[in-house]
Regions:
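Hydrophobic ligand-binding cavity/cleft-lining segments
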Residues: 1-42, 154
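Short, surface-exposed coil-to-beta transition loops
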Residues: 3-5, 59-64, 85-89
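Generic structural detector for well-ordered beta-strands
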Residues: 7-11, 38, 53, 65, ...
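A short, structured loop/turn motif at beta-sheet edges
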Residues: 11-15, 67-72, 91-100, 146
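Short, solvent-exposed helix-to-loop capping segments enriched in aromatics
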Residues: 19-32, 47-58, 127
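Short, highly charged C-terminal tails/helix-capping segments
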Residues: 34, 38-39, 137-154
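Short beta-strand segments that buttress and anchor functional surface loops
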Residues: 49-55, 75-82
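Beta-strand/loop substructures that line and gate deep hydrophobic ligand-binding cavities in soluble
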Residues: 78-134, 141, 150
Length: 154
């Protein structure tokens, strides 16, 4: 398995960040490559599942199964798409007047081959890291805008 991670401090309360993170109406604005929800059963609670599809240039159909959900602390899912599978762990913590959000992605390529490890190391890992960073960057912008306006999340 390969691992990538990124962290970002959002200038908003833990409650605001947590609530926005799990609001599906906001996902198109911040989840990298997100298209639409196909189905959701019990999500985001432990044991729940989510199936979503990306936009044209994205990952295709993505399925998630919630492994752990501790309100305002951690959310961990097992995921699978046509090219990869693994786990995404998201941790939330108060940091000063804001909220530190950390995403750790453990993944493996579903299709092997003699050059799979090299391809991952040279190309795919940086794309995965970039996707996490884009998502958190957009989450930060969206939540801070909502918090600054004094409005409730979507």
């Amino acid at each position: 398995m390969s691992r990538v991670s990124t962290s970002m401090t959002v200038n908003a309360s833990l409650a605001e960040v947590w609530d926005y993170y799990f609001d599906p109406e906001g996902w198109p604005a911040w989840v990298d490559g997100f298209g639409r929800v196909e189905s959701s059963t019990g999500y985001p609670e432990a044991g729940g599942s989510l199936r979503w599809v990306s936009g044209r240039a994205g990952r295709g159909e993505v399925t998630e199964r919630v492994l752990e959900h501790e309100p305002r602390r951690v959310h961990r899912v097992a995921f699978q798409d046509p090219e990869t599978e693994g786990e995404l762990n998201v941790a939330f913590a108060i940091e000063g007047d804001g909220t530190l959000v950390t995403q750790e992605l453990d993944y493996r390529l579903r299709r092997g081959g003699p050059l799979a490890k090299l391809t991952d190391r040279l190309f795919i890992r940086s794309q995965m890291r970039g996707s996490l960073a884009r998502s958190l960057g957009h989450l930060k912008l969206e939540v801070e805008e909502v918090a600054a306006a004094g409005a409730q999340p979507l």
